[in-house]
Amino acid sequence: ATIIPATTIKTDAKTAIDKKAEQQVTIINGNNDATDEEKAEARKLVEKAKIEAKSNITNSDTEREVNGAKTNGLEKINNIQPSTQTKTNAKQEINDKAQEQLIQINNTPDATEEEKQEATNRVNAGLAQAIQNINNAHSTQEVNESKTNSIATIKSVQPNVIKKPTAINSLTQEA
């Protein structure tokens, strides 16, 4: 009977896959541009790719096949990133509303340049706060609530039109 030497090629390949999957999950969890739901979806994909790669390694018959399965598995796991659409879309929507509001402010009749600038500053401050709130949000629900509140705040900003009407009023009264 022939004695077949023990080999660690498959075990080592599977260990490399496990380590890569663990690293990728850490990277996914650290992605602040993704919501919890988007991260969970990416982690599921990593787990699926890990199981598939280890199965391919198990089913390989030669060292070359094992190495090919390992390389393909590592590459597949490495390419899995969470979607960042939720936060990206929310920021874009808020930014669009802020730009619309700035146009409206600049077209306010009887507002002085100073009054328009003061309102513009409030919109920009609201926009900056909104982006920060979106960045700090974890769940899709938190992102959506933050977006809704931020848009309402930004849309409520109007110039305090006082100087020109007051001047016109006092001229009218003097006349």
PLM features: residue spans?
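Amphipathic alpha-helical assembly segments used for oligomerization, scaffolding, or translocation
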Residues: A1-A175
